[in-house]
Amino acid sequence: METIRPEELADLQLKRLKWTLRQAQEVGLYQKKFKEAGISPDDIRTLDDVEKLPFTYKKELQAGYPFGLFAVPLKEIIRIHTTSGTTGKPTVVGYTRQDLENWSELIARNMTMIGLGEDDI
């Protein structure tokens, strides 16, 4: 990944962004926000189009407490992380098995990138 050509990286980023936006459309909050903004994932044709996307605010995330912002059925969530931050009102993030596998791979790649190996941990 670290040696990918810039054009290939941009294509990959756009593909993954569109996938993420399609997933987000499964969440009522984002259905509403996309509709109000008059935008859909298909309207994102370049990375610069990210400027068309509406902002999400922490109060909106907190309003979804506890499970209102999951884009997958609750039975697919295998780990939950909550934080209260400074407001005392929780924000909840749910992770699927695939999310955790992706996270593990990302961390391993980052460790390799900075020169760490199996014997260093």
Question: Where are each of the predicted segments found?
Answer:
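Nucleotide 5′-phosphate-binding alpha/beta core
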Residues: 1-82, 88-105, 109-118
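Active-site-proximal cofactor/substrate-binding loop regions of enzyme domains
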Residues: 121
